[in-house]
Amino acid sequence: MKFVAFIAAIASAVAPVLGQTIELGSPQNGDVLQTGQNFTVQVIQPESMASVFQVGISLSIANCNNGVCPQPTQQLGDVLYAGPWTPTAHSPGGFYQNFTFPITSDFVKGPAVFTLSHFCLIGVWHTTLIKKLLWIL
């Protein structure tokens, strides 16, 4: 019985931390991007993260060779941005920051994985959060 209480206590302490995540407002999974045009990445901070200390993010893209996409934990691909993330309040829309990048002509057409890597400090926890999107270019 004490073991169950211990597990419940650990779960209640860990659950709020695991729920702390950032979101991608754009682009969305399956978006088609055109070579020679700019695209905007919108990184959203949910209100539940208002007390989190932001360290930084990286935004990267990797081609899927022969239909096989690399795992973002193994390969980031071309890093488009690595640095501070400072979301600001917008009405409506909450807290977010936009980043704009070009799709250059040397980028291979076809599916690609876009990776948002997030590092933040939540209390005494050190957490990295990774999200990925599949793009068709």
Regions flagged by a language model, labelled:
Residues 38, 45-91, 129, 134:
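Contiguous segments within soluble domain cores/interaction surfaces
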Residues 42-44, 60, 102, 117:
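Residue-level recognition of well-ordered beta-strand positions that form the cores
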Residues 24-29, 81-86, 98-101:
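Short structured motifs
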Residues 96-136:
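Internal, hydrophobic beta-strand segments that form the core of beta-sheet-rich folds
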Residues 1-23:
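Fungal secretory targeting signals
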Residues 18, 51-53, 108-110:
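Short loop/turn segments at connectors of secondary-structure elements within structured domains
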Residues 17-44, 49:
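N-terminal edge beta-strand
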